[in-house]
Amino acid sequence: MDYKTAGVDVEAGRAFVNRIRKSVEATHRPEVVGGLGGFGGLMRLPAGLKKPLLVSGTDGVGTKLELAQDHGGHHNVGIDLVAMCVNDVITSGAEPLFFLDYMATGALSPEAMATVVEGIAEGCRGSGCALLGGETAEMPGFYPSGRYDLAGFCVAVVEEEQLIDGRQIRAGDRILGIASSGIHSNGFSLVRRVLTHAGANAETTFGPSNQPLIESLLTPTQLYGRLVKTLLETGTPIHGMAHITGGGLPENLPRCLPEGLQAIVTPSSWTRPAIYDWLQSHGDIPERDLWHTFNLGIGYCLIVPEEGVSIAEKACESEGMQAWTIGRIEASSGGDGKGSVLGLPA
């Protein structure tokens, strides 16, 4: 008996590492020290920082992975993994520095795993951060053969005096909603349930233009890092930011609001993507559940003073992203308490 007969293929692991090497190294920033294969990734802090704060985040892709593995969407979930982490840490105004990934699988498929890492590398390049290392765990008997799970870890940096933490938010500020690219990576346990209930398959289409349903669902999560960097470099006065993930607008907008303020959102200010109408009609999903599960077309929010709206809109346009003024900030009715979101289904 040997390790391979026990279910762990060391040679396949080596082939996997050799295939991903170029993709990984292509993400490296000038601050990276050394290459792939060491026990730990090394990186210098960018030069010129006076009082740097490190910002960390970790996340996964959830059960979107099952849909991706059933339909060959390995590359896309690699991008998703980066986006879920990077989009969180940039809400503080931080610049992503490096990313680490963890993959666990029942039996290593070098082709599929390498495709995932190539997606991760694409996400890192699109976010300006280095893929500094990772771990691939082959765990026969623990995970089914051909199935894998992913986790990502991101570290970013921001000057302490430039930290965006919501303390500057004031009544009268505007909420700018940035378009999502689709469902992103939240709510897929409900999505999969609806797909099963509706008998949907790879041939199913939706909407007036008959878009392929599965392909649309597997669209990668939008990366907002470059946009935020552009906004900050052009001097856009950003008072707060929110990444709209699980819980939707009602549960994520309040996370950046200080005591005594609330958000007033106008749902008619943007057009809800057709995918949500399909899910609601085929799954009989209550309106409130839609709002508390999905992003409904808004993947990221900026809170800016009224005079900053046009600046932010131009920056979004320059990055090819659609944006709408979707609401405003007001004093909460009691004058205290940490933010709520009004204007949405209760």
From Swiss-Prot:
| GO MF annotation list | ATP binding; phosphoribosylamine-glycine ligase activity; phosphoribosylformylglycinamidine cyclo-ligase activity
Indicate what this protein is called per its UniProt record: Phosphoribosylformylglycinamidine cyclo-ligase
Please name the pathway.
Purine metabolism; IMP biosynthesis via de novo pathway; 5-amino-1-(5-phospho-D-ribosyl)imidazole from N(2)-formyl-N(1)-(5-phospho-D-ribosyl)glycinamide: step 2/2
Statement: the UniProt record of this protein carries the keyword Protein biosynthesis: no
Reaction(s) this enzyme catalyzes, per UniProt: 2-formamido-N(1)-(5-O-phospho-beta-D-ribosyl)acetamidine + ATP = 5-amino-1-(5-phospho-beta-D-ribosyl)imidazole + ADP + phosphate + H(+)
Question: What top-tier enzyme class does this entry carry?
Answer: ligase
Query: PANTHER family of this UniProt entry?
Result: TRIFUNCTIONAL PURINE BIOSYNTHETIC PROTEIN ADENOSINE-3, TRIFUNCTIONAL PURINE BIOSYNTHETIC PROTEIN ADENOSINE-3-RELATED
Instruction: Supply the source organism's classification.
Output: Bacteria, Bacillati, Cyanobacteriota, Cyanophyceae, Synechococcales
Decide whether keyword Cytoplasm is in the record.
Answer: yes
GO:BP terms for this protein?
'de novo' IMP biosynthetic process; adenine biosynthetic process
Pfam families from the UniProt entry: AIRS, AIRS_C
Underlying gene: purM
* Family stated for the protein in its record: Belongs to the AIR synthase family.
What subcellular locations does the record give? Cytoplasm
Q: What is the E.C. number? A: 6.3.3.1
Q: Which domain of life is it from?
A: Bacteria
Enumerate the UniProt keywords alphabetically: ATP-binding, Cytoplasm, Ligase, Nucleotide-binding, Purine biosynthesis
One Gene Ontology cellular component? cytosol
The protein's matches in CDD domains, at most eight in alphabetical order, are given as: PurM
